[in-house]
Every structure is written in C-alpha cells, then in structure tokens.
C-alpha cells in the first residue's frame, strides 16, 4: 500500500521517517496511547480502518490487536497544524496499553486536577 501523495507531502517526519500518532477513544474522549507511524502504516490504517503502527524496537509495522485481540477500529484520522502528528479516533476493544490497561495513561499521575 502506498500513501496518497497529497497526504504524504503534508507530513513532517523525523530522521527515521516516522511521525507521532496520538490515539483517542471515540466514546470517552480518553487518550489511550501514543505510538509511531511511517507512511505505510498510515496508508494501511486509512485503507483498512485498522490501527497500524511502527515499532521502533522491532523495526517493523504492527497491527494493534493482531496478537492480543485488543483491536482499534479507526473512526477518523486528523493531521495536526504542524504536520508532524496524527490523531486517531478509535473504537477500542479491550485494553489499549501493552500492560492490558485501558489506557497507557492510567497509572502515573504527575499533577492532579485542581478542584
């Protein structure tokens, strides 16, 4: 799969050809995770509506939930104003975090909300 050239020209990638993907749950608005994408991962995501990412540690693409069953059906994808981050709005099945938690941001609060 090849990324649409009209989309590709708008992306700003790091030295490794990657850009950030922020993943938000459609039903709750919760931020679930942050991951990396390359052009092919984004192209596959746009084509299939299955969240595809790029693993820097394994140096390969992966489909969220392909082994765990904790899938992400992609409702929408938006590009930020700088072109270096995409926002995926998803319907999450199971936990989004590799630990099994609902969100990767469930455990370590550094500053609590003020009432």
UniProtKB/Swiss-Prot annotation:
InterPro entries: PRA-CH, PRib_AMP_CycHydrolase_dom, PRib_AMP_CycHydrolase_sf. Its main location: cytoplasm. It catalyses: 1-(5-phospho-beta-D-ribosyl)-5'-AMP + H2O = 1-(5-phospho-beta-D-ribosyl)-5-[(5-phospho-beta-D-ribosylamino)methylideneamino]imidazole-4-carboxamide. GO terms for cellular component: cytoplasm. Binds 1 Mg(2+) ion per subunit. Belongs to the PRA-CH family. This is Phosphoribosyl-AMP cyclohydrolase. It comes from Mycobacterium leprae (strain TN).
